[in-house]
Amino acid sequence: MGSSQSKKRSEAWVRYSSALRQLVGGPVTPDGYKQIESSQGAEKQSLLRGRAYGTYSEGLDKVQNDPLTKDEKLDLTQQDPEEEEEVGFPVCRQVSLRVPSYKDLIDFSHFIKEKGGLGGIYYSRRREEILDLYAENEWGFEPGWQQYTTGPGTRYPKTFGFLFKLEPVSRAIGDEYAANNHLLHSSQLCPQEDPEGETLMWSGTLILPMTLQH
């Protein structure tokens, strides 16, 4: 059973990791609303499903109760189970909710590291929510475990056992400044969201479990 659960978590992580890495900014509409365009249409459809008790808005800036239109709801309910599994994230949690223990978070961190880790991914609240959603649906972690120390400088996880820290980085001039996505790329969203105005990126190196930051 453990092997089967690990396989399911691995398959789900591929989809969530893809969303973490592939979401890019879309063009700004005449009224200034920032839209999201996923490099894969299926990923965008997946993100709209969200949690079992709510769905993500198209902007993914916050969780709302029901952003889907009547036709979209009908389309989702008529999908075959196999198709739904192939296309998007689980609509319902796969395990019971619990407060993650130290061992849970250690195992979770090493699992993510083995699957490619979070290194090189710009931090944003949207991406934090995606990681939270994966932990909730596949591992049963109650929301609220992902918290970091304040800046400036390196942000360490407050929850003992989670081994990924956030490092401030300099924004490189590159694709993030392209006309089609510069307003929503995480390298620019992060300074707007961060009280210190820093651009943060998850570190690819796990911190030592005994490291405790106050």
Curated annotation (Swiss-Prot):
Lipidated sites in chain (N-myristoyl glycine): G2
GO cellular component terms given for this protein: host cell plasma membrane; membrane
Predominant cellular place of this UniProt entry's protein: host cell
GO molecular function, one term: GTP binding
Region (Disordered): 27-48
Location of the protein in the cell: Host cell membrane
Keywords: Host cell membrane, Host membrane, Host-virus interaction, Lipoprotein, Membrane, Myristate, Viral immunoevasion, Virulence
Gene3D superfamilies: Nef Regulatory Factor
Transmembrane segments: none
Chain residue ranges for the region called Mediates dimerization: 129-145
Topology versus the membrane: Lipid-anchor
Region feature Acidic, mapped onto this chain: 80-86
Protein's job: Seems to play a role in optimizing the host cell environment for viral replication without causing cell death by apoptosis. Enhances virus infectivity and pathogenicity. Probably involved in viral immune evasion mechanisms. In infected CD4(+) T-lymphocytes, down-regulates cell surface expression of CD4, CD28, CD3, and MHC-I or MHC-II molecules.
Quaternary context: Homodimer. Interacts with host CD247/TCRZ; this interaction induces down-regulation of cell surface TCR/CD3 complexes.
UniProt comment concerning the protein's domains: The N-terminal domain is composed of the N-myristoyl glycine and of a cluster of positively charged amino acids. It is required for inner plasma membrane targeting of Nef.
General remark: This is an African mandrill isolate.
Family the UniProt entry places it in: Belongs to the lentivirus primate group Nef protein family.
Record-given protein name: Protein Nef
Organism: Simian immunodeficiency virus (isolate GB1)
Gene name per UniProt: nef
